[in-house]
Amino acid sequence: MSGHSKWATTKHKKAVIDARRAKAFAKYIKNIEVAARAGGPDVAGNPALDLAVSKAKKASVPNDNIDRAVKRGAGLTGEVIDYAEIMYEVRGPQGSALLVECLTDNKNRAAADVRAAVTRNGGTMADSGSVSFLFERKGLVRLPAEGNTEDGLLEAVLEGGADAEEVVLSGDSFEILSDPSDLQSVAKALDEAGVEYESDELEFVPTMKVDLDASGARTFLRLTDALEDLDDVQNVFSNVDIAPEVLAELDED
C-alpha cells in the first residue's frame, strides 16, 4: 500500500511540475506574440521580440513553438492575436497584498476567473490604487547564492558599466535590483563577466514586507496557487515574507 501511495505521490508531483512548465512556456509564447504583433517578425529589427525570443530560448522553449509564435503574432498565419494587459489588486490574509498581472484576449473571462480564484481562496478584490502603492517597478535579476557573493556581483555589474541599486540575499538566491531602464545593461554586464543567472525580469517589488503565521501562510499559498494556475495570469507579485520556521511547520502538514 505504501508503495502505491509513493507512486501516486510521485505521479502527482510530476503532473504539477509538468503543468508549471507548460504554464511557463505559455507565458513566454504570449510575450513573443505580443512583441511580434507590435514590431513585426524580424528579430534583428525588433528589440522587444529579440528579448522575448532570447528569454524563451533560455527557458528551453522549443524552437518550433517560438517560430510559430512569431508568425502568429505578426499575422502571418491568418490568426488575429490581440492581447490586453490588465492589473488586478488583491488583499490577502493578515495584511498581505498582491498584484495580479494578466495578459488576455478576453477581458471578461480574465476578470471573472481572477475574481473567482480570489474569493474562493481567502482573498478580496481591492480598488485600483489601494494596493499598488505598496510596490515599486524594478528590474530584478535572480541568480543562485551558491558560488556568488554580494561584493562580487556588484563588482561584475559596475565593471560592465551598469548600475545596480542593491544586491539582496533572498533564501538561496541573490536578487540584483535596478531601475527598470537599467535591467538589460545589468544582465549584459553579468553575461560579459561569465556570471550565470536564472532570470531577468521587470517586477513589482514591495516597499515593505509582511510576515505571516502558519495559518496566514496556508491561505496565502492557496490563493497564489489558484491565481498562478489561471491561463490569463502572467505574474503574481506580493509583499509577503514567510519565515523559515513557518515554512517548516507547513512542511509538516
Swiss-Prot record:
Coiled coil: none annotated. GO terms for biological process: regulation of DNA-templated transcription. GO terms for cellular component: cytosol. It is found in: Cytoplasm. Pfam families: TACO1_YebC_N (PF20772), Transcrip_reg (PF01709). Keywords: Cytoplasm, DNA-binding, Transcription, Transcription regulation. One of its GO terms (molecular function) is DNA binding. Belongs to the TACO1 family. This is Probable transcriptional regulatory protein Mlut_12910. It comes from Micrococcus luteus (strain ATCC 4698 / DSM 20030 / JCM 1464 / CCM 169 / CCUG 5858 / IAM 1056 / NBRC 3333 / NCIMB 9278 / NCTC 2665 / VKM Ac-2230).
